[in-house]
Amino acid sequence: SGVPRVLIDEQAKTYVEYSSKIVFEPVNDGKEIVWMSERDGWCHLYLYDGVKGAVKSQITKGDWAVRNVINVDPRRREIIFSANGMRPGEDPYFVHYYRINFDGSGLVALTDAPATHTVKFSPDYSVYVDTWSRVDMAPVSQLRKTSDGAVLMELERASTDALVAAG
């Protein structure tokens, strides 16, 4: 009809900051929408019916937060995203990267070192460079496969030995 209408209406009794969290990824010619929401108290991904505006399923769930959506692949029905707080016993502020199917199955950790990761993907998302570090650890860069997170090769490992020796 060409008449605009509300598909998704988010309301909360508490303050919700969305300025840096807006994820609205239409897929399947707009018949579905990947949407980021804090509706369960944590920042997670949901699959919406793009025609009716109803939640079809919650893609991610748990006591952890999705930070950012990196890529939505409608053909493979996969999402690559960053998150924090997912790994028990680890600093909850460390950022890790994951891949998951639209139906919430097949979660694959793409990063594993207990550190904050910065990832740069190849244009086809088949491989990526994972650079990770902590305040007590110099950066390490590795080339990895997106299919399973396997390390293909270490690219670089910084060393602070000379600085520590110099005092």
Spans of model-derived segments:
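Beta-strand C-termini and the immediately following turn/loop, strongest in propeller blades
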Residues: 1, 23-40, 49, 59-60, ...
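Non-catalytic accessory segments flanking enzyme active sites
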Residues: 1-13, 17-23, 36, 68-72, ...
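Repetitive beta-architecture junctions, highlighting loop-to-beta-strand starts
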Residues: 2, 31, 43-45, 54, ...
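Polyanionic (Asp/Glu-rich) segments that form extended negatively charged tracts
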Residues: 5-6, 44-51, 55-61
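Short, flexible loop/turn elements at secondary-structure junctions
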Residues: 11, 37-39, 49-52, 63, ...
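Solvent-exposed strand-loop boundary residues in beta-sheet-rich modules
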Residues: 51, 101-103, 147
